[in-house]
């Protein structure tokens, strides 16, 4: 189950960024970002994910302050993590 502070589908930022906690159900193919093939883009390899915040599949994100995103998610701001 999602934690209480997880980003929800009706969150205005989530809507604006087309965030979906399940990347396979997201618009990542239609709105793919440069860096990796669309099917390899997800929050876990995005530079905005904060690996030291949250636990398990739920981590922090610089784009959603104080909230948690699913590492298997995707949004239109996905950017390949350096390194």
Curated annotation (Swiss-Prot):
PROSITE patterns: HIPIP. GO terms for molecular function: 4 iron, 4 sulfur cluster binding; electron transfer activity; metal ion binding. Thermostable. InterPro entries: High_potential_FeS_prot, HIPIP_sf. One of its GO terms (biological process) is aerobic electron transport chain. Pfam families: HIPIP. The keyword Metal-binding applies. [4Fe-4S] cluster binds at residues 43, 46, 61, 75. Keywords: 4Fe-4S, Electron transport, Iron, Iron-sulfur, Metal-binding, Transport. The keyword Ion transport does not apply. Homodimer. Belongs to the high-potential iron-sulfur protein (HiPIP) family. Specific class of high-redox-potential 4Fe-4S ferredoxins. Functions in anaerobic electron transport in most purple and in some other photosynthetic bacteria and in at least one genus (Paracoccus) of halophilic, denitrifying bacteria. This is High-potential iron-sulfur protein. The lineage of its organism: Bacteria, Pseudomonadati, Pseudomonadota, Gammaproteobacteria, Chromatiales.
